[in-house]
């Protein structure tokens, strides 16, 4: 028998058994907020449209300005939401 090959029954005897027991497990309240910055993707789409001559430079500038305004408004709303959530949790 090749000494590099471990017989199946011998191999399983060397591995200690593992057991998990969960006791007194209750429900827990978990809040997860995931924020993904999609600004680079939106900017890339605008640049692609400009490069493909699907929009003029003026249209690009206007769209970029609107995109930045939307991003700024969204960030300010999420900051307010975070403050409100913190105040609620402290009470």
Curated annotation (Swiss-Prot):
Segments of skewed composition (Polar residues): 76-91
Chain spans, region Disordered: 71-91
Protein name per UniProt: Uncharacterized protein YurS
Source organism (scientific name): Bacillus subtilis (strain 168)
UniProt lineage: Bacteria, Bacillati, Bacillota, Bacilli, Bacillales
